[in-house]
C-alpha cells in the first residue's frame, strides 16, 4: 500500500560498522531516529537488507556511534545496489560512498 511505501522511503540510508575500525561496514536503513536503551547502552534500530532479496533482511539494534549517515543516497538507491548484487553501485565517490579501489585482481596474481 502507498502508506507503507512512503514509510520505507522516509528511512535514512546509513553505514553500520561491525567489529570496530578493522571490521566490516554494511549499508542499511535507519528505521527511526529514536534512540533505544538496550542493556544500558544507546542503540538505534536499523534494517539490514540482504541480497538479492532485500526484503528478507532483518532488524538490528546497533550502537549509536557505529552508525554513519550516507548523504545523497535514498532507500531506492540502496535497494538497487542490493537487488543487483552490487553491480549497480553509484559512480565513484557519489552518494557518500567510498571511492572504488583501482586495482586489477588478475594482474595482482601474476
Which ranges hold each PLM region?
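Terminal membrane-proximal soluble interaction domains of membrane-associated proteins
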Residues: 6-110
